[in-house]
Amino acid sequence: MALDSAKKQEIVTKFGRGENDTGSSEVQIALLTKRISDLTEHLKVFKKDHASRLGLLKLVGQRRRLMRYFKRKDKDAYLKLVAELGIRDNI
């Protein structure tokens, strides 16, 4: 399920560097994390939805690549973001 614009704007203002900052790594990782958690909840109910499972795996891979890049560029901000989002630092 896609994020509605209000929820997306809330995430952008919380994690972005500016008001309309949608391209920074922090915002992209936060948006992907929200989409991943929504899809995970969906798959708990619909266990045989393999198309959504494939989409979930693609999102996780995309987030992993972004996190690897962000960790390499700004380690302190990366650790803060990981703690704030409540995700593991296994990259």
Swiss-Prot record:
Q: Which UniProt keywords apply?
A: Ribonucleoprotein, Ribosomal protein, RNA-binding, rRNA-binding
UniProt cross-references to Pfam families, sorted A to Z: Ribosomal_S15
Question: Quick check: keyword Iron in the entry?
Answer: no
Q: Its Gene Ontology molecular function terms? A: rRNA binding; structural constituent of ribosome
Q: Which GO terms describe its cellular component?
A: cytosolic small ribosomal subunit
Which CDD domains does the protein's record reference?
A: Ribosomal_S15p_S13e (cd00353)
Give yes or no: UniProt keyword RNA-binding.
yes
Q: Which GO terms describe its biological process?
A: translation
* Primary role: One of the primary rRNA binding proteins, it binds directly to 16S rRNA where it helps nucleate assembly of the platform of the 30S subunit by binding and bridging several RNA helices of the 16S rRNA.
Fetch the NCBIfam families from UniProt. Answer: S15_bact (TIGR00952)
Family the entry assigns: Belongs to the universal ribosomal protein uS15 family.
Checking PANTHER family in the record gives:
RIBOSOMAL PROTEIN S15, BACTERIAL AND ORGANELLAR, SMALL RIBOSOMAL SUBUNIT PROTEIN US15M
**What is its quaternary makeup?**
Part of the 30S ribosomal subunit. Forms a bridge to the 50S subunit in the 70S ribosome, contacting the 23S rRNA.
Entry protein name = Small ribosomal subunit protein uS15
Q: What is the lineage of its organism?
A: Bacteria, Pseudomonadati, Campylobacterota, Epsilonproteobacteria, Campylobacterales
